[in-house]
């Protein structure tokens, strides 16, 4: 429950940056992950099956967010490899948060709410 609260707190904090292309890409990716989570909970998928699915989910949204993160990091002076590493870490953090939420919600049928 604490991890779910943390994920939502981060999402709410980031939601204040409306109109920002990076935030829009992040939100699109996050909402796609949430849809995958909710569908998996409804379908009563197991944890290993969900983990396999979520690692590959939302390829278009993931790539868009990745590209924007890399561009932003390079704008701060990061080298390509550093920027890509950072982008991959940020994306994996979102996936891990969704996976953690699934672990909490799978047995109770709990659903996540998409960001507006």
What do these predicted ranges mean?
Residues 1-16:
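Classic N-terminal secretory signal peptides
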Residues 12-13, 38, 74:
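General secondary-structure edge motif
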Residues 22-68:
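Short N-proximal segments of mature Sec-exported proteins
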Residues 51-116:
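Compact alpha-helical subdomains of small soluble proteins
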């Amino acid at each position: 429950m604490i991890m779910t609260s943390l994920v939502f707190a981060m999402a709410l904090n980031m939601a204040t940056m409306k109109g920002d292309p990076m935030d829009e890409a992040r939100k699109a990716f996050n909402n796609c992950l949430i849809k995958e989570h909710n569908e998996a909970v409804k379908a009563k998928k197991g944890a290993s099956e969900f983990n396999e699915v979520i690692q590959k989910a939302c390829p278009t949204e993931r790539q868009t967010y990745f590209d924007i993160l890399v561009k932003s990091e390079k704008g701060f002076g990061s080298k390509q490899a550093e920027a890509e590493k950072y982008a991959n870490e940020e994306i994996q953090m979102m996936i891990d948060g969704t996976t953690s939420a699934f672990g909490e919600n799978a047995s109770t049928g709990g659903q996540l709410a998409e960001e507006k």
